[in-house]
Each structure stands twice: as structure tokens, then as C-alpha cells.
Amino acid sequence: ARKIAETFNTVVVVLTDAALATSQQPFKRPQFNEAWLAPPVDQSAVPAGAKPYDWDATTGIARRFIPGQPGGMHTITGLAHDRQSHVAYDQDINQEGLRARSLKIAALQKTLLPPEVIGDAEGDLLVIGWGSSKGAIEEAAAALRAEGKKVSSAHLRYLQPMQPGIKEIMQRFKKVITIETNYSDNPDDE
């Protein structure tokens, strides 16, 4: 999450669920991977005249000014702002900010890989899920494959932007089921 936030200068929201948050199980220590690291933070002095939101026209990404960085004084708010970081209520400035955010998401999507399909690349049924449903889905799909059924599974790691190739993967199966384990209301509670 930090690597995405630092690389694309954007907010990242990590979604989880109660089962994942409260479950306990042993796991193998992961092998360190350099690809997990965020790029180093540029703390050099900001060039004279540089604007804190000088968005790149193709990626929407601007150099990140670090608090306390020489020449990097600017305002940070959740409101629409111009390239100099002044709050602005002008529709053109708002549109420019929206476009920059959209370009950042598009740039991120270009770095994502399609979700891995567990089982055959095509078949009768594809079961898709995210979060803690992964283990149950893979276990059920494996049991059905052991019975000779053409069932595969896929696990989504990104919801916005979506990983590329999902539509093409889904088209290779006769049926697709998505699993959502969000239901937790008491059925007797009206």
C-alpha cells in the first residue's frame, strides 16, 4: 500500500474483513522481495518556482513536497486546489484535479498484472472472491476439480482500479460466481 501511495502520489485504502482481521493461523515467513519497497523519498531542495501540484499531463503525478523540505511550503487540504495549492472553487480547476486523479489511477492500473486463475484457464465455472474468502473458495474449487468438475477460482487483490484482463478471464468460463461474505445481519431482525 505504501509503495502505491508513494509511487503514484495518491491515497490508498486497504480493505479487510472481520474473518481476516480476527483469524489466527500459522504461515511461512515470506521471502523479502525488493519489489515491495517504495521508491526513496526525494528530500532535495525544491527548485525555485516549482509548484506542489504541477501534475504531469500523461500520468497526473506531481513531485511530492515533504513537510519541512526547503522551498516546499504549501497547503494541504481535502478541497479542490490549483497547482500552487490554493483552495479554489473554480470548475476548471476542479476538473483539472479530477483529471489528474483519474490519470494516476490509470497509470497504476498499467502496472497491475491480471489475477491468477487457480485451476484450468477455461472451463465450466469460475469462482471469484477477495479478502478472506480466498481459502474457502480455493478449497471448494479444488474439491470439485478432484471430482472431475471444470471449476477454477480467481482472487481479486485490487478493487479500484481493477486488475487488467478480468473480463477476458471471465469470458473463458460458461458461468461465473462471485462470493461476497458481507452478510452478517440477524435474519430474524426486521
Task: Give the label of every model feature segment.
Residues 3-190:
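Flexible, low-complexity linker and terminal segments
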